[in-house]
């Protein structure tokens, strides 16, 4: 249909940054004031995602942004930043191109769901 997708919260409110895989939010972090987000997270998935990234010499940010950018329907990745170095990191984060094996491994970590809406 020629539609594009603009993913909102490409880092899952920060869960895909690696900062929260221990299950605790660092003081002053965005999720420190939103404990319900971290409480609902699957920490095993977050740790497996971090392992996946490190095995490839990447950061979680690079994997998340690059995977999204590699999707044909994705027209852009919304990349918020609170510090200047984050702008640079975000811009450089889409250089990795996942292989079919990488995509299969990510599907094992985050199995596709049947329904993504609340209705």
Residue ranges and their predicted role:
Residues 1-52, 116-119:
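Glycine-rich, positively charged active-site loop/lid region within alpha/beta enzyme cores that binds
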Residues 4-7, 69, 108:
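Compositionally biased, intrinsically disordered/low-complexity regions enriched for serine, proline
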Residues 10, 38-95:
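Conserved short secondary-structure transition element at the edge of the structured enzyme core
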Residues 15-16, 71, 86, 109:
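Short secondary-structure boundary/hinge segments and terminal tails
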Residues 21-22, 82-85, 111, 116:
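Flavin-dependent oxidoreductase catalytic cores
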Residues 22, 86-91, 104-105:
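Short alpha-helical linear motifs
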Residues 28, 32-33, 78, 94, ...:
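Short amphipathic alpha-helical leader/targeting segments
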Residues 97-118:
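Extended hydrophobic/aromatic segments used for targeting, binding, or gating
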């Amino acid at each position: 249909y020629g539609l594009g997708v603009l993913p909102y919260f490409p880092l899952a409110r920060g869960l895909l940054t690696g900062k929260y895989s221990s299950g605790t939010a660092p003081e002053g972090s965005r999720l420190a004031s939103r404990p319900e987000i971290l409480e609902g997270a699957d920490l095993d998935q977050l740790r497996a995602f971090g392992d996946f990234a490190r095995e490839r010499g990447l950061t979680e940010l690079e994997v998340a942004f690059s995977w999204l950018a590699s999707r044909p329907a994705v027209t852009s990745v919304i990349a918020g930043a609170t510090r200047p170095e984050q702008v640079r990191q975000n811009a450089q984060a889409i250089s990795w191109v996942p292989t079919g094996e990488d995509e299969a491994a990510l599907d094992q970590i985050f199995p596709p769901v049947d329904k993504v809406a609340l209705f």
